Amino acid sequence: MLQMIPARPSRALASLSEAYEECRQITARYAKTFYLGTLLMPEAKRQAIWAIYVWCRRTDELVDGPQAAQTNFATLDAWERRLERLFAGEPEDDCDVALVDTLARYPLDIQPFRDMIEGQRMDLLQNRYSTFEDLYTYCYRVAGTVGLMSQPVMGIESTNSRAPWDPTTPPDPTQEALALGIANQLTNILRDVGEDARRGRIYLPQEELAQFNYSEQDLFNGVIDDRWRAFMQFQLDRARDYFEQAERGIRQLSHDARWPVWASLMLYREILDVIEQNNYDVFRKRAYVPTWRKLCSLPVAMLRATVL
């Protein structure tokens, strides 16, 4: 469990190396697949990504962690004020020290951070989403923002400019970074359907459930039939479309960021394959990618990062 909003420190804060080490340990503990991808980055970039991840996780745990019952709008308002102090260079605990250093090293914009907090406010307000457009807004705020936060750290390859006579439109790195975050969150949602349902939450578009004639009660009962399989296949296909869009932007990244981003994308997308292999049973089976498959993906990711 991570500490959320402690009082201002009465002791000396950690050194910079200690702060980044704490962020590394938290990332390794809570995000094993993601952490594996960060190890492929240069040291400075992976440390910055760890610091960003820890802030995002702490933000998420405000409404989704062990102390979530104590969180209200005032809690999130206080967290946003603390964010403003971080951007002003005022850390309040050890993990903050790492993020403040990251903010000094890279041109991060505060708006994606604010938007993520707004996503947590959405979680306090609602536990259903009528349309995919509504769900997309939520996905942007809680996950698409991560891509926007990370992009300045990853860097854009300046040599990717095209010849003036090339009629094709180059990918927009910002949109591709956003697409990867959306794809990851849609994957999380599909993997965690059963877990969320047990908490009374449904992150699946109500309109689309109705189109497949699948009711909330069916979902709470964990019914797996042709309706559910067709519905889930539709959702999986859409998530894969976002991963495909994200692929087009990877070649725009700096060379030293392409391998880890390819690895992260491939490893996360494999969760969708596992859901299919589990016959779409996300109620009783946890879709996870075995370690051996993760390791097998790394050389493929390296090849794609080099060739594409």
UniProtKB/Swiss-Prot annotation:
The keyword Cell cycle does not apply. One of its GO terms (biological process) is carotenoid biosynthetic process. SUPFAM superfamilies: Terpenoid synthases. Its cofactor is ATP; Mn(2+); Mg(2+). Its EC number is 2.5.1.32. It catalyses: 2 (2E,6E,10E)-geranylgeranyl diphosphate = 15-cis-phytoene + 2 diphosphate. It comes from the Bacteria. Pathway: Carotenoid biosynthesis; phytoene biosynthesis. One of its GO terms (molecular function) is metal ion binding. Keywords: Carotenoid biosynthesis, Magnesium, Manganese, Metal-binding, Transferase. It holds the Pfam family SQS_PSY. The keyword Manganese applies. Coiled coil: none annotated. ATP is required for the transferase activity but it does not seem to be hydrolyzed during the reaction. Involved in the biosynthesis of carotenoids. Catalyzes the condensation of two molecules of geranylgeranyl diphosphate (GGPP) to give prephytoene diphosphate (PPPP) and the subsequent rearrangement of the cyclopropylcarbinyl intermediate to yield 15-cis-phytoene. NCBIfam families: PhytoSynCyanob. Belongs to the phytoene/squalene synthase family. This is 15-cis-phytoene synthase. It comes from Synechococcus elongatus (strain ATCC 33912 / PCC 7942 / FACHB-805) (Anacystis nidulans R2).
